[in-house]
């Protein structure tokens, strides 16, 4: 089965290519922290030879509580992203929540992201597709892997085939997510690259009184399980002080653990992709 290659500048994203990393922080907490986090990611990924795209959100529009921190907003967020790109010369990805944001974000970011909760919103999907930008499509927690075909078709019908799929877990009762490893094989039938968002797969939605809980201690175990499935790469969030992060701290990797964490996953990715394909159907 031929696998499509999506090119982000000089980076090739495909299920049969070396793993890429879409990594950063959950939300832009401040300009200085964003610069600190990106600098560490760049240092580590350059050392390990992992192609890298910086990730953060300018607005978290689906927080549990009305009092939760959402981010700096569109205008200030784009200013921070522009400075990061100038300083570190890295591609950028961020999420879009409303149709009118799509074109603005696509002018600054190399990849625009369709949030999981919004992935069936046709007006948003079409607006994003019409920008011509690469789109990272998060699989909704309530969708089966095969249902992602409908979202891909919406984008294709709007004239955009620069698409990446991203697994982030499925709802399993209340306040819990699980990852069905069989889903990766189903989505590979669509031939687009697949990333694994290990951070949000560890989330426990609504698990705390006014925000999501998480299972940071299991991030390496779950990341290894995902990378073993011959994927295009990993989607990861890290934080200098996860216990005091403004969003999804319980899921975030400690920033000072980034190098040993990625070193193991790179080695695993190389091993898995060195094996010949065995057809078992």
From Swiss-Prot:
Q: What is its main location?
A: cytoplasm
Does the record's keyword annotation contain Transferase? yes
List, in alphabetical order, the GO biological process terms annotated in this UniProt record.
keto-3-deoxy-D-manno-octulosonic acid biosynthetic process
Keyword match Cytoplasm: yes
Which EC numbers characterise this protein's activity in its record?
A: 2.5.1.55
Q: Where does this polypeptide localize?
A: Cytoplasm
Q: Which reaction does it catalyse?
A: D-arabinose 5-phosphate + phosphoenolpyruvate + H2O = 3-deoxy-alpha-D-manno-2-octulosonate-8-phosphate + phosphate
According to its UniProt record, this protein's enzyme class is transferase
Q: Which family does it belong to?
A: Belongs to the KdsA family.
Identify this protein by name. Answer: 2-dehydro-3-deoxyphosphooctonate aldolase
Q: Which organism is it from?
A: Pseudomonas syringae pv. syringae (strain B728a)
Q: What is the lineage of its organism?
A: Bacteria, Pseudomonadati, Pseudomonadota, Gammaproteobacteria, Pseudomonadales
């Amino acid at each position: 089965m031929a696998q499509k290659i999506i090119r982000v500048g000089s980076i090739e994203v495909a299920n049969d290519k070396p793993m890429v990393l879409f990594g950063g922080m959950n939300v832009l907490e401040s300009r200085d922290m964003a610069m600190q986090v990106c600098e560490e990611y760049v240092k580590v990924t350059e050392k390990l030879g992992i192609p890298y795209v910086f990730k953060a959100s300018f607005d978290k529009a689906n927080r549990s509580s009305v009092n939760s921190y959402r981010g700096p907003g569109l205008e200030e967020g784009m200013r921070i992203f522009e400075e990061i790109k100038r300083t570190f010369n890295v591609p950028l990805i961020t999420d879009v929540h409303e149709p009118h944001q799509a074109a603005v974000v696509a002018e600054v970011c190399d990849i625009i992201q369709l949030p999981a909760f919004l992935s069936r919103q046709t007006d948003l999907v079409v607006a994003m597709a019409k920008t011509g930008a690469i789109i990272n499509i998060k699989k909704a927690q309530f969708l089966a892997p095969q249902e992602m075909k409908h979202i891909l078709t919406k984008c294709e019908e709007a004239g955009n085939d620069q698409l990446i799929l991203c697994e982030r877990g499925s709802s399993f009762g209340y306040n819990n997510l699980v990852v069905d490893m069989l889903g990766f094989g189903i989505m590979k039938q669509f031939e687009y690259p697949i990333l694994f968002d290990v951070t949000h797969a560890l989330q426990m939605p609504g698990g705390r009184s006014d925000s999501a809980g998480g299972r940071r201690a299991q991030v390496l175990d779950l990341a290894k399980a995902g990378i073993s499935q011959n994927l295009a790469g990993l989607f990861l969030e890290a934080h200098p002080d996860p216990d005091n992060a403004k969003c999804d701290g319980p899921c975030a990797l400690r920033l000072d653990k980034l190098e040993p964490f990625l070193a193991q996953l790179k080695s695993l990715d190389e091993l898995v992709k060195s094996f010949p394909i065995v057809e078992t159907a």
